[in-house]
Amino acid sequence: MDSSLAISGGPRLSNREWPRWPQPGDRALKSLEDVLTSGRWTISCAYQGRDSYERQFASAFADYCGSAMCVPISTGTASLAIALEACGVGAGDEVIVPGLSWVASASAVLGINAVPVLVDVDPATYCLDPAATEAAITERTRAITVVHAYSAVADLDALLDIARRHGLPLIEDCAHAHGAGFRGRPVGAHGAAGVFSMQGSKLLTCGEGGALVTDDADVALRAEHLRADGRVVRREPVGVGEMELEETGRMMGSNACLSEFHAAVLLDQLELLDGQNARRTRAADHLTDRLSELGMTAQATAPGTTARAYYRYLVRLPDEVLAVAPVERFAHALTAELGFAVTQTHRPLNDNPLNRPSSRRRFATDARYLERVDPSRFDLPAAKRAHESVVSFSHEVLLAPLDAIDDIARAFRKVLDNVREVSR
């Protein structure tokens, strides 16, 4: 039997049809048809005599996150920017941002004319490093943002302690972590606010969407103003044909509302989330056991994690493998064997072509500001190391049966056995 690698013309190890994403539930189509005929396609349309899907989702997701309040928002990026402003961050303020993340972690800060301070990550969890965080705090720091990255929960014990001692709000970015938990409580409910993305690749998705959860009524009220052009949902009942949004004039905002279509899909997806997460965790645990036999190190999570949510499965290659084959070539070889995309981590934000504030005139307020927001001024050795040593794949693969997960382990073994072929 030909054992050469698929990238060299050999046979693929697996010809399976892997699970696709997103996966609609049973109620999605009926709910979307209901929105179409309801006469109300968004919260800013007139009240039609029943709770909107947006209001239903706000209530359901607040309950799911163990939070008092939820403000649905159009995207995860907008949710983060709104959370920062709602917590008092403004122009020129510094915000701690993890250096290994999607560009939105920085662009949301830039979007409110604040300054992203890129901080290195823990070398095992790839989440914000507490010691590096404390070292980066200055008299200009106004908030700490932490991403629960890929499949890990960050060290909230240490980060919350730092935030309290310095009098700073901690904002949890849970874009990868719908359903994860820390010390028995859902992520997003530990800091001043938690924000979520419901973009198409996420564990809970409606194509594009977001949300902010909080126990702080003042933060929630400011977030409502910021996402609805300075309007808030009326607290008193309204009649059919009346506007449910009230113009208060207390705080200027912009339009970042979530439509009824998106909210309807989210209610459908929320019913499926826990079951899907359980299947992913079972598959991830099985794969971690198999790959550990090959000398691979799976992404760790902080002590105190009580539930993991696998947005992406990450594993670090052994040093002796990396000495022979670059990580991008190893990932490419796995992709060829399995038929789904295996990639590196995000590129660190200090060396990421998507994170270039100088490419936009809106950030050219003055030369000093451009210097402060220049990402290349930060050193992120652990983030760089992760990008150069870790391979990853998306969560829907973990919804496959366990015999398919065994194929993944066999693909790793095949590439390892032919690693010098990968280096060509």
UniProtKB/Swiss-Prot annotation:
GO BP terms: namely:
polysaccharide biosynthetic process; streptomycin biosynthetic process
> What is this enzyme's catalytic activity, as reactions?
scyllo-inosose + L-glutamine = 1-amino-1-deoxy-scyllo-inositol + 2-oxoglutaramate
Keywords, ordered alphabetically: Aminotransferase, Antibiotic biosynthesis, Pyridoxal phosphate, Transferase
The EC category is transferase
Give the region (Disordered) as residue ranges. 1-21
Cofactor(s) the protein needs: pyridoxal 5'-phosphate
Q: Which GO terms describe its molecular function?
A: glutamine-scyllo-inositol transaminase activity; pyridoxal phosphate binding
- Which InterPro entries does the UniProt record give? DegT/StrS_aminotransferase, PyrdxlP-dep_Trfase, PyrdxlP-dep_Trfase_major, PyrdxlP-dep_Trfase_small
Keyword Phosphoprotein on entry: no
UniProt modified residues of type N6-(pyridoxal phosphate)lysine: 202
The reply on keyword Transferase is: yes
- EC number(s) for this protein? 2.6.1.50
SUPFAM superfamilies reported in the protein's UniProt record: PLP-dependent transferases
User: Gene3D superfamilies in the record, alphabetically?
Assistant: Aspartate Aminotransferase, domain 1, Type I PLP-dependent aspartate aminotransferase-like (Major domain)
Q: In which pathway does it act?
A: Antibiotic biosynthesis; streptomycin biosynthesis
Function noted in UniProt? Catalyzes the PLP-dependent transamination of scyllo-inosose to form scyllo-inosamine.
Family stated for the protein in its record: Belongs to the DegT/DnrJ/EryC1 family. L-glutamine:2-deoxy-scyllo-inosose/scyllo-inosose aminotransferase subfamily.
Subunit note: Homodimer.
- State what protein this is by name: L-glutamine:scyllo-inosose aminotransferase
Give the taxonomic lineage as stored in the record.
Answer: Bacteria, Bacillati, Actinomycetota, Actinomycetes, Kitasatosporales
